[in-house]
């Protein structure tokens, strides 16, 4: 219960500070309201341009622009002017949710929820006597654009990959309503967590 309490307080604070992706706030609140379940880091899907010192050097990477809605060509062009050192990629990534459960039974149910909602990369594993379910889609796109501040692709090609990336982003997001429906069904089955009810009333005035 202590871990969920801390997770809820962190989520509520992030919501108040507008640090949670707007289109998944209600879904996150729904998931966290379920008994024996809470979320950690989650994202509604994003697209952007990232600069990496070398392949796989994620800790040192730098987003030149990152948005959770379709990106505009003009935004991408402007962001590319700030490239300095390293490999430049356009990346589009689907929604991802990290859901912790207190039982294997709940983990299996949420695993099935993810898969049946179209998130085909959904998996789960054991961490510190709890179960972590990663609800993840397949709509990943990574396109190299240049290196060390130089862009090697034409505007026409950049427009093309942005269009594809935006389509993939929205395809991933289109599965969110189905995911919400499934979690609503789970809540009806499992019940609402009194801790969520108490804390949300105090912190969010829901």
From Swiss-Prot:
Catalysis: reaction(s): 4-demethyl-7-[(3S)-3-amino-3-carboxypropyl]wyosine(37) in tRNA(Phe) + S-adenosyl-L-methionine = 7-[(3S)-3-amino-3-carboxypropyl]wyosine(37) in tRNA(Phe) + S-adenosyl-L-homocysteine + H(+)
Keyword Transferase recorded: yes
Keyword Cytoplasm: no
Stored InterPro entries: Taw3 (IPR022908), tRNA_yW-synthesising (IPR003827), tRNA_yW-synthesising-like_sf (IPR036602)
EC number(s) on file: 2.1.1.282
Molecular functions per Gene Ontology: tRNA methyltransferase activity
Keywords linked to the UniProt accession: Methyltransferase, S-adenosyl-L-methionine, Transferase, tRNA processing
A biological process term (GO) from this entry: wybutosine biosynthetic process
Similarity comment: family membership: Belongs to the TYW3 family.
HAMAP family: TYW3_archaea (MF_00266)
Described purpose of this protein according to its UniProt entry: S-adenosyl-L-methionine-dependent methyltransferase that acts as a component of the wyosine derivatives biosynthesis pathway.
Name assigned to this protein: tRNA(Phe) 7-((3-amino-3-carboxypropyl)-4-demethylwyosine(37)-N(4))-methyltransferase 2
Species in which this protein is naturally found: Pyrococcus furiosus (strain ATCC 43587 / DSM 3638 / JCM 8422 / Vc1)
Lineage of producing organism: Archaea, Methanobacteriati, Methanobacteriota, Thermococci, Thermococcales
